[in-house]
Amino acid sequence: MRRIISRSVILMFLFDMLAIASASYFSYRYFGLPQRFHIPTVLLTTVLGAIVLYLKSQYKIREFNVTKRNYYLLFEGVIFFNIVPFALLFFFVPKMSLVCYYALTILLTYVALELYRFLFHFYLFNFKKVKNVLIIGSDNNAKIIAEEIINKKALRMKVAGFFTDVEDENYQFVEDCGIPIYLNPYDLAKVIRKQRISVVIIAVKRRMEEQWLTHMVRSIPEGVKVYKMPEFYEMITGKYFVSKMSINWLFYDYMNKRSMLYDACKRIYDVIAATIILTVTFPILLYIGIRVKMTDGGPAIYTQTRVGKNGKKFKMYKLRTMYINDYKPKAGEISENTANVNDDRVIPFCKFVRKARFDEIPQMINILKGEMSIVGPRTEWEDLVKIYSEEISYYPCRMWVKTGWTGWAQINQGHCVMNDDISEKLQYDLYYLKHRNLFWEIGILVKAVFLALSGRHG
């Protein structure tokens, strides 16, 4: 399945690069701009286009759909990656010609990219072969993975049947879906052949008998992919499947993955990234701080007690964006309004400051002190940690690593406080915990910065 998704992504990526380069090349030639800047401009536009479209999540095939939001994000991205070449040519090209070049390049690029996506969507949902999936089991694990496959139509997969020898609590769900249920394990080979099964997912909680395992080995032909349910769940959601058994395996993965070299490299990366971010944004922070100070005379920077790695408390630095207030969320006051930029307590000019996450840049001080990391699970209030730890199973596991300024959960889900959302955020955090590596973390940081500047991070 990874190969199938990768082929689709590669094909779309290559077409995008061709469309961007062609649009830039044609516009440049059409308006007769200086020859010496021709090739550099086309190359720069193409490279920036690749980066921006990736950061705009244009290559998430498993979630691909045609929506107004996607139209907007693509158009916004096309404008973004053409700004830099426009700015570089500003002093060397007649202004009217440059404006016309910029407008025509945006128009041609957007039309080409949108047309390809429309055709890809049409092909995906009308001509691409649907892969039949057989799920071994009918318990809660089977229900969860079946729902994910049914809801993610862009996967082009269909649950063709369940194999089980036990009628459990989710047996009714299986029947309600109208999906065949096979109760005789020894019909496996016949069902795979008859239903043309391409993927088998093992979704049973209990330990399978040796006799049944041997029968599956004999019955499942070559070419049929076999996945454990948690592994398949991670592949199609980017989240960790949380259960008592999976947490045990996560513990072993985490313990065996610990490395002094990784920790040292990550620390160097944290220090370098935090220093660069602080240096680049210092003039902006100074301006915001002065304006906040002039608003009501209160401090520009304040601290909050947060919980970090292994439950250790520390003082986290933040740029104040609200009027002086000792407000802190209590157990009965947790609501989405806690982080709402339209809250009346927010200083008016600080609404964008919060939206772009400039108020969180002072956390670079915590990173330089070693209390936080650039990438990791979001740090939380002490009171909220107590509540979530009591109400959400395995919540403390996310504190096995340093909390982060940004993270996998933040760029995929954003900020949340409701328990159902926190449970989902935990899945993202544990996925990061299992798969963390330095190159991936650099990508998360780049995407987080881009989303923050777009006003969409968190």
Predicted feature descriptions by range:
Residues M1-D16, F64, F118-F282:
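N-terminal hydrophobic signal-anchor/signal peptide
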Residues M1-N126, G458:
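Signature of alpha-helical transmembrane segments in polytopic membrane proteins
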Residues Y262-Y327, N366, L438, G443-G458:
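A hydrophobic, helix-centered structural microdomain
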Residues Y233-E234, K239-V242, I301-P348, T406-K425:
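Short, glycine-rich, amphipathic interfacial segments at transmembrane boundaries or analogous
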Residues A339-K402, I444-A448, A452:
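A short, structured surface patch at a secondary-structure boundary
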Residues I392-G458:
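C-terminal terminal-structure detector
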Residues R117-V130, G289-I301:
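Aromatic-capped interface at the extracytoplasmic side
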Residues G137, V200, V226, P283, ...:
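Residue-level signature of catalytic and energy-coupling elements of molecular machines
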